[in-house]
Amino acid sequence: DIQLTYHRRHTTTTKVGNLEIGSEHPVRVQTMANTSTNDIDGSVAQANRCFAAGAELLRYTTQGMREVESLAQIRKAVQEFSSSGVTPLVADVHFQSDVADAAAKVVEKVRINPGNYIDPARKFKQIDYTDEEYQAELERLRQRFVLLLHICKEHKTALRIGVNHGSLSDRIMSRYGDTPEGMVESCMEFLRVAVAEDFKDIVLSIKASNTRVMVTTVRLLVWQMQEEKS
């Protein structure tokens, strides 16, 4: 028999509604809707099909406040369909931190992208920061992210920190380059704030189209988390 040396890393348990995620639980099945979030009837019908087929979480693109309002209606209808009550919805938010705040009051989980949560849309510009200026940017990040964490605590909403290789901020790119180290630091900036605020209902993801880059980055992230005991 082939003996595999890989094993699941021990983690805390993240609660997404009534669903538990972590090393002590099965790997969960999540999918993403391809309907317009504002097509409420179509989105509800697709959600019901997804959950009936075995999906455990369903993610919706959430571009603005109109989509947040639509998500609230979708969630209400989906919960009425569910016999178990375990049908968590996820809002996928980019560029607008206030939309993430609003979505956290409506659904069970919110995904944010560190590359555009508070930093402006990427312009592929090299920006030279002094150490003091860089720390000031990190403090600005902390102050804004803490507001979202407090909302999530109040509403028992989970968070996903979802880093994309293709959307690292100009700030990260200027200091770390287009590297696994930059992706890891983009994630860790937010995770450090969550740890300091004792917020544990959190999921991490790092994606790259190049699988070697992605595997290297995930391993580096695990090493960095172990170093910082986070």
Specify the residue positions occupied by each region the protein language model found:
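Alpha-helix-loop-beta-strand connector modules within alpha/beta enzyme cores
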Residues: 65-91, 139-156, 185, 189, ...
